[in-house]
């Protein structure tokens, strides 16, 4: 499990550094962040994404939260974003695996390996594109564990951060 995550993060980071901005949707957020701070219309961006040309589509908070990456060199920003998202997700998988192990047969390593085996192939495309879905899925996994343990404030903070990044978290 952990070796597969390490390899995935390493490969995705190398690709992001070698081919910054290629097959990336995260640049839409960074452009919006720069436009926000320049008092420009961030919904008027026409950055090319995997889906074609479209402007920024999300809550303004996600652009503001993207600010630290918006001013880094593109390759560095792409690499940091992907490594951060995948790390948050892998850690979330580990926390969920530990929770499942408490209530079933097998240790957390087994459940983490199984989740990794099933999850990594389905998330590789999003990781390569710099999708925010990676980090919000990780935030939801962390929130799930915190909800189980009745850590209400921490779960609420994680879910609020997820909603700020992408409104899809509202479903959770």
Where do the model's predicted regions map?
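Transmembrane and membrane-interface helices of multi-pass
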Residues: 103, 107-123
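Membrane-interface transmembrane helices that cradle and orient dolichyl/undecaprenyl
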Residues: 141-154
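TM-lumen/periplasm interface segments of multi-pass membrane proteins
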Residues: 1-106, 125
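Short acidic/glycine- and proline-prone juxtamembrane loop motifs at membrane-interface regions
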Residues: 127-133
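Alpha-helical transmembrane segments of multi-pass membrane proteins
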Residues: 87, 134-144, 168
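Membrane-interface alpha helices of multi-pass inner-membrane proteins
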Residues: 153-172
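Residue-level signature of the transmembrane alpha-helical core
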Residues: 83, 115-118, 142-143, 157-161
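Residue-level recognition of pore/gate-forming positions within transmembrane alpha-helices
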Residues: 82-86, 133, 163
């Amino acid at each position: 499990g952990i070796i597969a995550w390490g390899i995935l993060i390493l490969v995705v980071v190398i690709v992001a550094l070698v081919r910054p901005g290629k097959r990336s949707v995260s640049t839409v957020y960074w452009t919006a962040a720069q436009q926000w701070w320049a008092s420009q219309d961030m919904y008027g961006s026409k950055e090319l994404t995997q889906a074609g040309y479209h402007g920024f589509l999300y809550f303004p908070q996600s652009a503001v939260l993207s600010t630290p990456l918006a001013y880094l060199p593109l390759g560095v920003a792409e690499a940091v974003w992907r490594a951060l998202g995948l790390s948050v997700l892998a850690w979330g998988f580990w926390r969920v695996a530990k929770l499942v192990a408490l209530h079933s047969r097998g240790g957390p390593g087994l459940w983490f390996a199984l989740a990794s085996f099933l999850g990594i192939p389905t998330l590789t495309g999003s990781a390569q594109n710099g999708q925010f879905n990676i980090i919000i899925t990780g935030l939801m996994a962390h929130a799930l564990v915190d909800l189980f343990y009745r850590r209400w404030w921490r779960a609420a903070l994680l879910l609020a951060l997820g909603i700020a990044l992408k409104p899809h978290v509202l479903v959770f």
